[in-house]
Regions:
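Flexible phosphate-sensing "switch/lid" loops adjacent to ATP/NTP-binding sites
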Residues: 1-235
């Protein structure tokens, strides 16, 4: 994407999905915010959205011992701490448009069903729920050239399958506008004293089974990842 594209209209938004594999706590939020900062420094208008797996409507009523402290947004939303990371890195105020949960999504689909928004159709999880995810992402992206979508949880969990299906559909419809960044971990067991790429390979294989081929892999490790491991993962 060149700087000559800066004048494009909002319907030419680029979508960068950021997912995680192998284990939780790898820093998907920091990765997404860092990418956003780099793109913003190049002159693009950038925003973020966090997609949570849980059925709670926000983070305010979740035990902080279980989920961590909440981040209070300017509009009153009690959200995940990753929104605080977005706010600090991008130097913008975040709020409702930058945060969604599976509970919000299902509630909206059920309300639309009750209001006959689907004209009496039989409403199944697929395709109606992923379509609501896509609608929310596009709504959050309005007015921006690039949006980074952080998918909560770890690849392969049944709780977040809907989000990955939404990505697959968007990639199918807009292949030139959608990419996938997968954050993984390369362990280094003490008794072996070398990096192991197999967990990352299996995580990518999990994505492949859902019809997803990541465009970039961000590898976290306790030492420099050598070319041998990079080649294994790239293959």
């Amino acid at each position: 994407m060149s700087s000559s594209q800066h004048g494009k209209s909002p319907d030419q938004t680029k979508y960068i999905f950021v997912s995680g594999g192998v284990l939780s706590g790898l820093g998907k939020g920091v990765t997404a915010a860092s990418l956003g900062l780099l793109l913003k420094s190049r002159g693009y208008t950038v925003t973020n959205i966090k997609c949570e797996n849980y059925l709670n409507l926000d983070s305010g009523n979740i035990n902080p011992i279980e989920h961590g402290d909440v981040f209070l947004c300017e509009d009153g939303l009690e959200a995940d701490l990753d929104l605080g990371t977005y706010e600090r890195f991008l130097d913008v105020n975040v709020g409702q448009r930058n945060f969604t949960t599976m509970g919000q999504i299902y509630l909206k689909v059920i309300e639309d069903t009750k209001n006959l928004s689907f004209n009496g159709a039989t409403v199944d999880a697929i395709p109606y729920v992923p379509e609501e995810v896509i609608r929310r992402i596009k709504s959050a992206a309005k007015g921006f050239q690039i949006i980074l979508i952080e998918l909560g949880g770890t690849a392969g969990e049944y709780q977040n399958a809907i989000y990955y299906e939404a990505y697959r559909v968007m990639k199918l419809r807009q292949p030139q506008d959608v990419i996938h960044v997968h954050v993984t971990y390369f362990p280094s067991p003490e008794h072996i004293n070398e990096l192991k790429s197999k967990p990352t390979q299996l995580s990518v294989k999990m994505l492949n089974s859902m019809g997803i081929q990541p465009d970039f892999i961000v590898g976290r490790a306790e030492r420099i990842i050598d070319n041998k491991r990079k080649e294994k993962v790239a293959f």
